[in-house]
Amino acid sequence: MNFDRQNLTDDTLVDLYKRILKPRLIEEKMLILIRQGKVSKWFSGIGQEAISVGVTAVLDQDEYILPMHRNLGVFTGRNIPLYRLFSQWQGKANGFTKGRDRSFHFGTQQYKIIGMISHLGPQLGIADGIALANKLKKNGKVTAVFTGEGATSEGDFHEALNIASVWELPVLFVIENNGYGLSTPTNEQYRCENLADKGIGYGMESHIVDGNNILEVYNLLSDLKASMKINPRPVLLEFKTFRMRGHEEASGTKYVPQELMDQWAIKDPVENYRKYLKANGVLTEDFDEA
């Protein structure tokens, strides 16, 4: 994996490492808790952390994000207290949904996060509405909305991108292409080689990004955010990554070829970034062990 720090300081590189490590450590704990029966379900984002972490790190704290069920890095990136998050996942009364849900179906105005909609497509249109309000206010704010490659087959995807393009709304449409929609591989979902190519039909700028490379994510998003403040517009981003766990923990990954799992395992976003920082003297052994 090729990491390009560009003009990032050592402090920024270490901060990004802390940001990407935090959701990974939480996820590893959650996998234990689900087997102990202390949580009832879990939608893992292991292997996809660089995307949500990188996007959230670039946006201002008062800019809205509309995440999915695998975007733990959005919630940790906004520094939501862990006791509130764990209360939510365990269905406790002091969780965000007061025990009515034990997953990521919640939002919080305090942290400018809009709760996910299960089939994902509809939240793209909501992002358009937020972006329209920002454009009318001329405040230079950007809105980021996450979706999966499966949801790009929904009608909501077309409607949201079409109106965003026509009205030049400042929206970052983030597609996490992780190879599978539930148990359906991408070659059974669509015929185009890259989903980013769909941007052409809307006259929309689009990019293909290595979703496992935290620096590539962060650097591109930093440039786009600065540019969109001057020239408000929508941008379609296809992040290539892979779902290393089941759709949710109970479903497993038996339908995924083992060679594909092995191929992506060596592209782990956390481990590869750690190795890069150590090799370049940015991360010391003492710091990493701590």
Where are these regions (language model features)?
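Conserved acidic/glycine
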Residues: 1-51, 57-58, 250-290
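N-proximal short alpha-helices
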Residues: 3, 24, 96-100, 237, ...
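Cofactor-binding active-site loop characterized by glycine-rich and histidine/acidic residues
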Residues: 28, 32, 37-167, 185-191, ...
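Glycine-rich ThDP/TPP pyrophosphate-binding loop and its adjacent helix/strand module
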Residues: 113-290
